[in-house]
Amino acid sequence: MDVSTNELAILAIVLLATGVLFYAKGTRRAPLPPGPRGIPFFGNLFQVDAMRPYPQYLKWAQKYGPVVSIKLGGQHVIVLNSSEAADELLVTRSKQYSSRESPHVAFDLVSDQQQMLFMPYGREWKIVRKNVHGLLGPGSSKQMRKMQDLESRVILHDLLCHGETSISEDFVEGPHGEVPERHWFSIIRRYTTSLMMTLMYGHRIHRIVDNPELHQVYAVVSNFTHVSQPGRYLVDVFPVLRRLPDIMAPWRAEGKKMHEWEMGFWGKLFSDSRTALLDGSGLDGFVQSYLRSRAEAGCEDLPGKGVTEDAAGWMRDKLVTYTASGIIEAGSDTTSTAMFSFVLLMLSNPDALQRAKEEMDAVVGSSRMPGWEDEDRLPWLKACIKETLRRAPPLPLGVPHKTEEDDVYNGRLIPKGSTVIGNIWAIHMDPIRYPNPTSFKPERFYHPDEKLDWASGPDTHDRDHYIFGWGRRFCSGKHIAEASLFIVLSRLIWGFDLYTGSDAKTGQARLPDVNDEATFTDGLVAAPKIYPVGFKPRSEKHAEMIKASYRDVQNDWQSMGLAGDER
């Protein structure tokens, strides 16, 4: 398609007029919260690394205060840098702040507007949320504990077998971020992915070698965290660019291609589940159960996207597919990220690690593995997990909200349509709330004389951290995530001595610096890049118990009708 000079001139006029109106409107509606000075039309766009914005946002928080106003092109952004501001706006006033500023490429194109994470607040989102909350809520999540128990035993076995593999200097990340098979990152990822896959589709990830399904999940996750980062594409911050013809909008073809790639994977899982349901084979996950209920209501065949318009509001096929994929992606990636950060921080703080071992030996000993009954008996371990989530939140900026109407906070205007970011990173780095915030200090959360709660629920008072978000957008999967963190990390501390390799030339430990931004990936999720860790059984008795437990687990899989592990 050819674009004439007149068309380009019209486009330039539209863009210029949009910028003028935007700034004129902003001037008339002052006072806005304080913030850095920008340049006409582009605002602060060139002052922020779009793929890693949270370090700059922290600097602005320290300079301008708890609420900062910035402009990213045509997008007005309000950054909330204190727990008080975030709690007041995103929780107390959640009716006004529960929508999303959906990234155009990630939401409209890649997920065809079916990704729950970025759905605007409305009927469709409420229907999806109701189904998800019923699946992941406190009561339902306890039913997952048997699976978490069994899958965590498989982790111990795999680390026992491949505990020294990850130390090799040749065992490094692939050119596109691929994690080598048998690397301890892959072993952890298999656990989190298998758990979510069983929950959604009724089948396990039962191999760590030659398992394209596991690699595909993380390829999709990696791509999604990059394309969904606010500001990743100019069209996300200049909505007027969405009107451009295809020849001038390369992101459009790129996004649609990504959608086809995703649906090639997620769509096959969905269709296989439907076939298994019709054949009466396999176990039920969420998808099979939902499709059965839908069929019993006379709505067996619902192609397309969105929900039905009747009172029942049944999710159509593509929305069911993306609801399942969203839970798998979020539950797999963020939980494994927290586990990688825990190991990094514990190795970087050997005194905290040694104290965790001593507590484990005193409470559990070597004659059994830690179990759910030990959760309140291991306050130091639990404090270490909480401090990990504070010091290295998987999503430093959470997922942005959007205000539906003008609002005023502390005398400052928050305009309708603004993107509103709960700056988890700035809140967690607040030196008043968390003295010496860059230090790893589990004693912040160590209360051995009290019955321990994770204290991370939607109740805003006395929250330890904010990684699960705020208000009506609070993460439904927190109970499953917290349970996984406890059972896996407690057993890891119980069963193994952790160590890191040394550089052959310098003799220095090959452990990345947690204070170096380059240690973590960019994009929506900040995960440690792969690093070498060895896992040595703490004794022969521990090793034999891990082996025996793994053998017992195979009998459990068989009795449950699930695939046994192939090693």
Curated annotation (Swiss-Prot):
InterPro entries, alphabetically?
Answer: Cyt_P450, Cyt_P450_E_grp-I, Cyt_P450_sf, Cytochrome_P450_fung
Pathway(s) of this molecule: Secondary metabolite biosynthesis
User: In the record, what terms sit under GO molecular function?
Assistant: heme binding; iron ion binding; monooxygenase activity; oxidoreductase activity, acting on paired donors, with incorporation or reduction of molecular oxygen
Tell where it localizes.
Answer: Membrane
* Physiological role: Cytochrome P450 monooxygenase that is able to use anthracene, carbazole, pyrene, and phenanthrene as substrates for oxidation. These multifunctional properties against a series of polycyclic aromatic hydrocarbons (PAHs) suggest that CYP231 would play important roles, at least in part, in fungal metabolic systems involved in xenobiotic detoxification.
Q: What is this protein called?
A: Cytochrome P450 monooxygenase 231
Instruction: Summarize where heme binds, as residue positions.
Output: 475
Q: What is its EC number?
A: 1.-.-.-
Provenance organism: Postia placenta (strain ATCC 44394 / Madison 698-R) (Brown rot fungus)
Using the UniProt annotation, give the residues that carry a glycan (glycosylation sites): 81, 223
What keyword terms does UniProt attach to this protein?
Answer: Glycoprotein, Heme, Iron, Membrane, Metal-binding, Monooxygenase, Oxidoreductase, Transmembrane, Transmembrane helix
Supply the source organism's classification: Eukaryota, Fungi, Dikarya, Basidiomycota, Agaricomycotina
Q: Where are the transmembrane segments?
A: 3-23
